């Protein structure tokens, strides 16, 4: 082999490594490791040095993050429950989602945003519950305050969301900040949008004090809303996500279609169109929709026509136990009977030439 060709072959593996995108949020696997924080820190593959340092230095925060993974993945699956890609996770895969998030798609944008939001939520909650040594209630919410109803005293335990955001930024963004490529910038943007979304739903709660509930005195605190509000908000952002391209100097984005508005810090951004997720595809990581339950009467994404990609569906007759004939008995109980309900369940057919093994 001549010298130029030999040089190309020597460089090819490195070139492929550089060109192949990587799902960089390996910390997602923290929810599956279990055990002590040291076991967690040492057994999650792909953490960069600053993440491992934070992991060893703050084991109580890592426990909160690990528990939070279960919460935000469940929220992701709730939001995508009626779609072809249903945010399904893979056992024994440190990226949790497999190759599907290698594509810089809307789905990737949502997952990075909801995971970042989940870290903020989990850490902030752990702080308020006294489970983290390095933080507690928000120290800035002391003394008196004023709102449209008048003067009040700060009391109770205001959620220290600024600590949650600061720690989430340092931990979650660490690997992305080491990269200068387009995908790293996309992830950083969506991570930040996710963090901001939790703070958006911080609400003031108050308790009245005074004679006969006169509310002459009020004690107030700031509390995070249920995580479902954040999930619903990011779902709306997913549906309105903006496709972008890198600008010429490689430092930011510009819209792919000039007819659309420039993305704000609250918007989700993506580079690539999504696959249709209809069939199992090892290249894209799609598990397909064969075996998925569909809704025969729906006209939405969960309809048998859309979910099954026009392949048709199978119908099975099943029975299930339900509560029926419920009556209120004084005082104070509701008593029900157990009844069998017969219903039809419709599941998507597999492609005739597909290598299908298990439903998603």
Curated annotation (Swiss-Prot):
Q: Where in the cell is it found?
A: Secreted, Extracellular space, Extracellular matrix
Q: List, alphabetically, the Pfam families matched.
A: wnt
The gene name on file is WNT2
Would you kindly state one Gene Ontology biological process term found in this protein's UniProt entry?
A: animal organ development
- Highest taxon above the source species: Eukaryota
What name does the UniProt record give this protein?
A: Protein Wnt-2
Q: Where is the signal peptide?
A: 1-25
Cellular component (GO) terms are:
extracellular space
The yes or no answer to whether the keyword Signal is present is yes
| Lipid tethering residues (O-palmitoleoyl serine) | 212
| Subcellular location, principal | secreted
Q: What does this protein do?
A: Ligand for members of the frizzled family of seven transmembrane receptors. Probable developmental protein. May be a signaling molecule which affects the development of discrete regions of tissues. Is likely to signal over only few cell diameters.
A single GO molecular function, which one?
cytokine activity
Glyco sites are at: 295
């Amino acid at each position: 082999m001549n010298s130029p060709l030999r040089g190309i072959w020597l460089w090819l593996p490195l070139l492929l490594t550089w060109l192949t995108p990587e799902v960089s949020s390996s910390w997602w696997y923290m929810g599956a490791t279990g055990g002590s924080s040291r076991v967690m820190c040492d057994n999650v593959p792909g953490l960069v040095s600053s993440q491992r340092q934070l992991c060893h230095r703050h084991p109580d925060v890592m426990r909160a993050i690990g528990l939070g993974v279960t919460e935000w993945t469940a929220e992701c699956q709730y939001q995508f429950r009626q779609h072809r890609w249903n945010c399904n996770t893979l056992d024994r895969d440190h990226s949790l989602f497999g190759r599907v998030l290698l594509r810089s798609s809307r789905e990737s944008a949502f997952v990075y945003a909801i995971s970042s939001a989940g870290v903020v939520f989990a850490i902030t909650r752990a702080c308020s519950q006294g489970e983290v040594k390095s933080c507690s209630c928000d120290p800035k919410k002391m003394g008196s305050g004023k709102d449209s109803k008048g003067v009040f005293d700060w009391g109770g335990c205001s959620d220290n969301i600024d600590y949650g955001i600061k720690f989430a930024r340092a931990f979650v963004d660490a690997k992305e900040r080491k990269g200068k490529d387009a995908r790293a910038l996309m992830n950083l943007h969506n991570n930040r949008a996710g963090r901001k979304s939790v703070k958006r739903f911080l609400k003031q709660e108050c308790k009245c004090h005074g004679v006969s509930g006169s509310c002459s005195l009020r004690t107030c605190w700031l509390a995070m809303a249920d995580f479902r509000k954040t999930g619903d908000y990011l779902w709306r952002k997913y549906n309105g996500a903006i496709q972008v391209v890198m600008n010429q100097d490689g430092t930011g984005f510009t819209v792919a279609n000039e007819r659309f508005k420039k993305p704000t810090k609250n918007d989700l951004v993506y580079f690539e169109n999504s696959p249709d997720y209809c069939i199992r595809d090892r290249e894209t990581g799609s598990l397909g929709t064969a075996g998925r339950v569909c809704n025969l009467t729906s006209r939405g994404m969960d309809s048998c026509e859309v979910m099954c990609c026009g392949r048709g569906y199978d119908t099975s007759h099943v029975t299930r136990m339900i509560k029926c004939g419920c009556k209120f008995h004084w005082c104070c109980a509701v008593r029900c009977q157990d009844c069998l309900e017969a219903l039809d369940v419709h599941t998507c057919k597999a492609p005739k030439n597909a290598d299908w093994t298990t439903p998603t």
